[in-house]
Amino acid sequence: MDAPIEVDTQRARFQNSTGRNIQYVDDVSWIKSKHTLQFGGNFRHIPTIHIRNDKVVGSLASLEALSDADVSTFLSAIPSSERPPTCSVTLTTGCLQSGDAQRWDRLYASTLGLVDNIGILTTRDGSLKALPFGTPLANDTTLNAVEFYGQDVFRITPNLTLTYGLSYGWQTAPKERLNRQTLVVDTSNNNQSLTGPGYIAAKEAAALQGKMYNPTLGFDPVKSAGRNVFNIDWGDVAPRASVAWTPTFDSGFLHRMTGNRKTVIRGGFGLVYDRINTVQSVIIPMLGVGFAQTISVGAPLCNASGTPGAGCNAAAGTGSPGAASFRVGVDGSLPLPTVPAVSIPVVPSTPFGELFSFQDDPNTKVGRSRAGDLTIQREIPGNMIVEIGWTGRWSDRLPQGVNFNSAPYFFVDQASKQSFAQAYDAVATALAAGQTPAAQPFFENQLAGLIGSACAGSSTATTATQFLANAAASNFTGGLVSSLFSVMDGRRTCLGLPTFQNRQLFDLHMRTYIGKSNYNGLIATLRKRTSHGLTFDATYTFSKTLDQNISNQNQAGIYSNSYFPNVDYGPSLFDRTHIFNLSYVYDLPLGKGHRFGGGSWTSRLLGGWYTSGIFSAFSGLPLFVTESSQVWGGGSIFGFAVGMIPTVNPSSFGNSVHGGVTGSNGIGTTGNPANKGTGLNLFADPAAVFGDFRNVQISKDGRTGRANPIRGLPYWNLDSSLGKKTALTERVSFRITADFFNIFNHVNFVDPTLSLTQKASFGVISTQLVPTNRDNTLADGSRWIQLGLRFEF
């Protein structure tokens, strides 16, 4: 088991989208003196019907029973008494490495069939009446997109042209035929709509003062709220301007450099707006609470169905989940969830009346990019043109998700002034070293009264710190901050104390507009126009793109740190420093009219041959040694894995394939040739490299390891073609071709995984990179030859 909820719904689910695009476009051009004026408009009416039987993850419109441990929604953490001891300096056999405690707990829960929750997706009609189990979720929406533009190409002189213009547009929010959309609201504040930045800022401010911020959330149907799921962004004004200059110098150095009207200098700047795609405009608004709801039975006890199996001890509670929890196949029929009655606004019950909700920020903005470029183009002898230039993009307001239930890891205990982060790091450091952690004031004060109470179950711990270290050791050693907050909230609920997190939902994903990225690139291009049968185009790019580890609009990802997204600021996952591409076509100088000609039949035999090819070479993508996605409390499911901190310069590791690597100390060992491994590894000594990274310390570190990545394997490939065209008559000819994909049979490998939780496969290379045009069951990434014969008439 590797997740606390059913993530494989994305394999079992079905989705159907039926969309149309009714579009009207009108453009006008008017030439007046030195001006070429252009005006136009674009109107789109976009009706869309989307039907699905899932809510991304967590449930289907059919019953599911889920098993997990440690990052569970409901199931108690596996206590240390039910796992082998943690290895230390003095204990090296019959023990678990600190990073393997979570894997053991999950094996324990899945082997015994311990049920975390039993759930199903239930849907409601436009009046919130529950529909029969198995009814899929459906939305029938319409929206409009409008754009206008104006532009002037002003040829000031024969050598100088100025282009400037302005565009303006907007996109409406989707209108659902039965109003089956909701907004998340604060029920204690007159059902005020909540925004992503506003909620996160309020929660942060409260935590720094040692206070809880958990307003009771409601989900208000748009008809009741009297508004759309998000506001129209009316401010998308997009100016742009560019200039092109052909210098004319009659003599001297500048004349020799620029030639006689053979050089063009171009520069420009523009503001460009994104569009809101179907996921954000149609799908997310239908995944809120109310018209779609995951109902569940959380952590049922072994006697829940009245037919407990052997060994059932429901009274053991959290002290022994193996004895107290419902066991699939042992304790009878699964207990069924009950569909709750709802009112307006829909208020999920506690604990976890709903597992997940997806919402659009009602104040969402359209992403934008400030784009600039400056290039110099020069014609040179040989029918060639060389161009060198810079291009840049600075983007903001990009769509990205925040989690309302991001754990406030900076929460300050007002009595001791110790933060959760400080207490957490102290315990995590001690456990990693195999030591007993000292009592931490934060845990003792925030869980006051726990020791000696029924809320501690059968634990023999004498301090709250020891209780947490025993019950949730892997939460400390594995960076599972969100899960640890869930454990603490469970105990605080039992003690009658307010919780750190909202307990109505496990996670609330809100798509908001605070993402940032930038790109800068130096581009050099050499183009040859066709002469002597040869034409080619060669381009080299030296660039860097940086972002906050954000994802595309159609992704469900959230920031690993919703409070401070810039902790992940670093090279984008697709960043390549060096990129070179070359394409060419060459008509061989054979046959009539060429250097090597001949008679009629000789010319027909020798003539018409040509070759072409595409060569590509890239430097490696950024790679990160990762721990969990919960390091900053971002959430259990949708967050991105956090990069560990390198203690040496990652460039010292290199980025080439090493052969004959067996691995050691349980690190990189799946590649051992003696165990039928590949023997290939990104590192000559994976264990040594693994030791050069440390866990993020949330009380001290302001950035993650994404700021300083390892670079993955470089790539190069040549595809080439050889062909001949032969004329039979004036109107009939035939062509034979031989296309060679990866003509040199060069192996390109997929970058390996580098995860704290998968030590055995650390750095192990086991997969070839298969081009998208291959049938990987037949050719993999090896040389592929395609022969062709074509008649033309």
What kind of region is each of these model predictions?
Residues 1, 19, 44, 54-64, ...:
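Flexible, surface-exposed loop regions and adjacent strand-edge segments
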Residues 19, 143-175, 179-180, 190-192, ...:
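Structural signature of Gram-negative outer-membrane beta-barrels, strongest in the C-terminal barrel
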Residues 1-23, 30, 115-133, 300, ...:
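Acidic/polar loop-and-plug regions of large Gram-negative outer-membrane beta-barrel proteins
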Residues 133, 140-142, 159, 169-173, ...:
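Short, solvent-exposed micro-motifs at the edges of structured domains
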Residues 260-301, 396-402, 612-617:
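Surface-exposed extracellular loop regions of Gram-negative outer-membrane beta-barrel proteins
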Residues 76-110, 114, 120-124, 190-219, ...:
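Surface-exposed intrinsically disordered loops and tails
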Residues 25-27, 33, 40, 151-153, ...:
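Alpha-helical hinge/cap motifs
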